[in-house]
Design a protein with these regions (language model features):
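Glycine-rich phosphate/nucleotide-binding loop
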Residues: 9-109
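Active-site nucleophile and cofactor-binding loops and adjacent substrate-binding regions
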Residues: 3, 70-72, 122
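Short acidic loop-to-helix transition motifs that present clustered carboxylates
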Residues: 1-8
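Glycine-rich phosphate/pyrophosphate-binding loop and the adjoining helix
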Residues: 100-137
Length: 137
């Protein structure tokens, strides 16, 4: 399937594409597009898996333009760590993190990047958002 048709297909029918194997450049486009459906690249977790090794990481970049400003959204990294814990069989720890994360969002406490998109939410700094998640554990 060519890339433009694939991008349309995954956006219209994301549940039909739980696993995608493609070249790195194509998956970069697809991951950005699909991340938009769940809040953006700041919230979407990332994993690279093989039979021999797996890496769990935030989905994109280092954002040098916001370094040191305490405004980065740590959700992608937190959810990647949660996914890693589930993958290695530490399900209880995984559930604690995902439950605390979900509770924090339900309390309408989110980072600035998402608060700009959702009315009625409290915009928190990176560190305050992390503290709220920890408090909900």
């Amino acid at each position: 399937m060519i890339t433009d048709a694939f991008l349309q297909e995954v956006l219209l029918n994301p549940k039909d594409h739980d696993v995608v194997a493609t070249l790195n450049l194509n998956v970069d486009y697809a991951s950005d597009a699909l991340a938009a459906q769940v809040g953006g690249i700041g919230i979407s977790p990332g994993a690279n898996m093989s039979d021999e090794a797996s890496i769990f990481e935030a989905t994109h970049g280092t954002a040098p333009n916001i370094a040191g400003k305490n405004i980065a959204n740590p959700s992608s990294l937190i959810l990647s760590a949660q996914m890693m814990l589930e993958y290695i069989g530490w399900t209880e720890a995984s559930y604690v993190i995902s439950g605390a994360f979900e509770k924090t969002l339900k309390e309408n406490k989110i980072t600035e990047d998402l608060a700009n998109q959702i009315k009625g939410c409290e915009a928190l700094s990176t560190s305050d958002f992390a503290k709220e998640i920890i408090a909900n554990m």
